[in-house]
Amino acid sequence: MTDSSGWPGAFFWITMVSVVILNTANGIYQNSVFGMAAKLPPKYTGAVVLGANLSGTFTALLSFFSEYMAPNIRTAAIYYFITALFILLACFDTYFALPINRFYRYSELLHQKAASKRQLENKATGKQDTPPYWKIFRQCFPQLFNTFFVFFVTLALFPNVHSDIQSSDPHFVISGKYYATVMCFLTFNTTALIGSSIASLVQWPSKKYLVIPVVWRVLYIPLFLFCNYQPKDIARVLPVYINNDWVYFVIAVTMGVSSGYFSSVSMMYCPRMVESQHSATAGMFGAASLITGIFTGIMFSMVMPSLVANVSLGLS
């Protein structure tokens, strides 16, 4: 490992540039994957979301075991790097293996035939052969909003607020050292994985009414703030109304399950809102809404410490 204590400024900018490059590449990759999955039956779009939640669960487990087994942070970092390298190689292999898959080639062939037929029809009628992006956006907008709002609420709470909630009972079954790791990261990622798995079996409610439970999820924001949320270097003014660790655990579980479930369902509904030849474009719009929801949710989470430091409801 390199000692960067002698050049902190250069290290900072190298880190920032690396983060920008990595996240830009991740955004392009994620958008492309959702576009590819949108050409397949809806359950495959749900499988992409499920895979994202599975990676979160795997990371949370890795964090827990490295914290438990690694003697120091440097050793834990080596474990993380080696694991990430193997997973990256596996993903690289599957990327090149996908076109060999017979089912994917069959679905791609159907999509190409539909596109060729549309091109011939447009050529005969003199229409421009470009996707009607605005029309696709308007048709998908209800599900785009659902996707955005699910991730907005989730990322407004996880991990910034979620990880700063402290135990209210010193004798709780999970010790203070592992409290945030288990109650926040492991609980959320595992329950989100369960929610995504349920969505692959059952999609409810319908496209028209999905917005109702999605909007109701905004109530998780005050519920989490009412728990024993103690942001660092902030004097909390808002009273702690939920001081039972088991109640907090139930709230965290339902938040995680609903996040995984409704995000999967909304992403699965999105390509169904348009004609089959536009499903890939609709999937990419859905991925853009997902990323936008994540970004705005993270930005909004920065307001939470100020809320508990300046707002006192005065409820008895």
Protein language model regions, located:
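Membrane-interfacial loop- and helix-cap regions that link adjacent transmembrane helices
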Residues: 1-18, 97-98, 102-265, 269, ...
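Loop-to-transmembrane helix entry/capping segments in MFS-fold secondary transporters
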Residues: 13, 31-32, 36-52, 178, ...
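Glycine-rich segments within core transmembrane alpha-helices of 12-TM secondary carriers
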Residues: 22, 26, 41-91, 182-193, ...
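Cytoplasm-facing ends of alpha-helical transmembrane segments in multi-pass membrane proteins
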Residues: 23-40, 90-102, 261-271
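Membrane-helix interface/capping residues of multi-pass secondary transporters
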Residues: 42, 77, 206-209, 279
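Interfacial helix-cap and linker-helix signal at transmembrane-aqueous boundaries
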Residues: 66-72, 165-166, 202-203, 304-308
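A late C-terminal transmembrane helix in Major Facilitator Superfamily
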Residues: 244, 248-257, 266, 274-307
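Extracellular/lumenal N-termini and interhelical loops of multi-pass eukaryotic membrane proteins
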Residues: 311-316
